Amino acid sequence: MNAIDTQNLEKHTPMMRQYLTLKAEHPEMLLFYRMGDFYELFYDDAKKASELLGISLTARGKSGGDPIPMAGLPYHAVEGYLAKLVQLRVSVAICEQVGDPATSKGPVERKVVRLVTPGTLTDEALLQEKQDNLLAAVYHGKSGYGYATLDISSGRFVVAELASTEALEAELQRTNPAELLYSEDFSEMGLISGFNGKRRRPEWEFDFDTSQKLLLDQFGTKDLRGFGLDNARLSLQAAGCLMQYVKDTQRTALPHINSIVRFNQSDSIVLDAATRRNLELTVNLQGGHENTLASVLDNTATPMGSRMLQRWIHEPLRNQQQIESRQSALTEILDTNLFETLEPQLKALGDVERITARLALRSARPRDFARLKQAISLLPEIQQSLANCQSAHLHHLARMLGEFPDELELLERAIVDNPPMLIRDGGVLKEGYNAELDQWRALSQGATDYLSELEAREKEQTGISTLKVGYNRVHGYYIEVSRRESDLVPLSYQRRQTLKNTERYIIAELKEHEEKVLSSQGKALALEKQLWEQLFDQILPKLHDLQLFAQGAAELDVINNFAERAETLNYSCPTLSQKSGIHIEGGRHPVVEQVSQTPFIANPVTLNPARKMLIVTGPNMGGKSTYMRQVALITLMTHIGCYVPAQSAVIGPVDRIFTRIGAADDLASGRSTFMVEMTETANILHNATTESLVLMDEIGRGTSTYDGLSLAWSAAEYLAQKIEAMTLFATHYFELTQLPELISNVENVHLDAIEHGDTIVFMHAVQEGAASKSYGLQVAALAGVPGKVITAAKHKLHHLESRDTNSAVDSMTTSNQQSMVFDEPVNSALNDALDKIHPDELSPRQALDILYELKRLTS
């Protein structure tokens, strides 16, 4: 391994000493070191970049007698490589040449001018347009955890005080930060071990006094009470570290970070990490984004609307007034078909939210200004579309959009319609915007009239009919003469280039003009950059209004999208009730109905104080898990203000949604499937309330029959009697179907199936009462389990069912019985005869004959 030798810098070349000094300032980042047209990496950085980016690993010079590993990439392709590294949660320090090579003695002066970290991205090319890109910080104190998140690409700054590790785990799942800062002495590393973008920070960055001062300076206030941050010490410490890190990486003012919000769990329905995962809200169980609730609901017109929708899905409201306000706006848009008008108008807005953040950071590019110009030019049209609406919420959103006539006039006067990507390319500002700029540009573009006059004069003086004045980027200005007339060229002409049929020359007058032109190009570009910076100064006073515009447009987009989804997917408006319970008629799973190849079977559910728990039985593959999940998703959709996939739905107060559905070994933590299941069950039993919706699926499968049945029974009993939570409890323990006889608020329902011979048809219809059997053997046969195994299982099942539960358990544990399960049946002739019988095809006489034959075989 080639370790960096920083102790003996004098042994290295001056250039390598410069590199090592800069690298020592950013030890945890890859250092892109600019050398001419390439960024070079050395030592372990080179090895890591070669592995991650697939670029060649070479060597340059030696260190301690060993070649120094080196890898390079062209400067013009750097954004593509940065995008790959950011996806891998790798941070990069970009070092540029800031000195003049012509005047430098020794290595050209270089400086790190940009830090690219996963959580501090603002560049459009590096961001996922439909996902928030969050930087987070966590601090552990005696009373719990402080947690802070910042989306630097929008300025959204949120803190939370969390009392338990479960609450922190849920927040990490909800926010999914791109980069996570933690203190040197953070004690719960197991909680954050799965995050690739972890960054350890010194303890002093979490100091309370330092953090408070940083935040007060940022917001320009005397205290933080106005932000509701009283008694939020831990979250302020996390926020302070986060603010320090952003200042270090951005190295510029952050005016768009002008407020901070405290996230209160009591304002929204609490969803723990397991619930977010099991319901596949925005990420499916395989880690992708297909076939999730968000994928079905998201037909938004703007990227900022898509990001807001995902936040809403993860933060379902509890405030009935806020929910109904969204519903009323949605209903009006739907009833008037306004969504058809608004959708194309909103689509043309683009991503105003992130453009505004780049304006604040002064990193906006010419095309950002062009897009902003287009967006604010559309506002009168959108305002007109909303003018006749009755909904108070739509009027509120219209006011948030605002008006920007002065800024529109400025941008229309300043920015060309199709600007280049970068200001350094020039040609961004319109002709007529600045008289001095126009003059320098005219000169830099070669003063065409002067060149025409020069060409005419030289033709006349020399008598050369083929003489032309031209220009190219390599050789500059020249006088071109055909080869056959080159003998007429005056002595004052100096040959510049020889081509096949022509000669090119330069004269003193043309050389002087060239120098003026090149000088004027530099002056024109310098002035354009100066005027460009002044544009930021003229727009930024409206920063807060632009942020409100982006927020209002995003919310209008989400609600308009809900209206379109309701129309397209046949959703209905749910009713919110103050009475406890959930009543759904014709409910459907919003995702499964979209991907199913067959018509989806809608089902009802009723939960109320007299019917708090439903014991759900039925065959595997019968639809129990789908049924339970759809109840949770319809409830959640109601609380984000969306219409729902049901004929009707009345939803009472809900404070939490819990799911214990499916499990897998947690190998990283060394926990078995059963341990994961029991941990999730414990969390539910400790935290559920009478207003919680609980989904419990197959509790107790991972242990012995006795243990599993006992745990499932006790958990169901505790939920129904002690907590009285609204519960759907799916099980294959048929003993649990006796609970309704013992507990008044428990009922049985089952998913129906029809058996025909050895086949089974799943009806997916929910019926009252318990299932008659589980159809496990039929499902096993459908799955392709060998026929001999199925036959042996039928015999064992018949044997077990003929005895009571205790003897059945005993018989399953005896070694001689275990060894006989897969033996050939003793009387194979009898079994063969039975297999050949088709009862539906027999006459009474044939049936009697077969009965005598079977009796003979058994004798």
UniProtKB/Swiss-Prot annotation:
GO terms for molecular function: ATP binding; ATP-dependent DNA damage sensor activity; damaged DNA binding; mismatched DNA binding. Keywords: ATP-binding, DNA damage, DNA repair, DNA-binding, Nucleotide-binding. Pfam families: MutS_I, MutS_II, MutS_III, MutS_IV, MutS_V. Gene3D superfamilies: 1.10.1420.10, 6.10.140.430, DNA repair protein MutS, domain I (3.40.1170.10), MutS, connector domain (3.30.420.110), P-loop containing nucleotide triphosphate hydrolases (3.40.50.300). GO terms for cellular component: cytosol. GO terms for biological process: mismatch repair. The keyword rRNA processing does not apply. ATP binds at residues 618-625. It comes from the Bacteria. This protein is involved in the repair of mismatches in DNA. It is possible that it carries out the mismatch recognition step. This protein has a weak ATPase activity. Belongs to the DNA mismatch repair MutS family. This is DNA mismatch repair protein MutS. It comes from Shewanella sediminis (strain HAW-EB3). The gene is mutS.
